[in-house]
Amino acid sequence: MVTINGEPRAAEGLTVLELLASMQLIPERTAVMIGGEILPKSNYNQTLADGDEVDLIGFVGGG
């Protein structure tokens, strides 16, 4: 199990990009933290492992 924003989810084995796609999130507008560390967008092909704690932060434009 992977914990995503505090909720357990069976996402181990997915890459970060696959996870974002499954959640209908836009990678360019989503910051990803794994284990409390910000993941650079260049590493979004990283595979999630059992026990990873992931936080997703979406950005919305506006004015």
Predicted segments, located by residue:
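Ubiquitin-like/PB1-type beta-grasp interaction modules and other compact soluble beta-rich domains
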Residues: 1-62
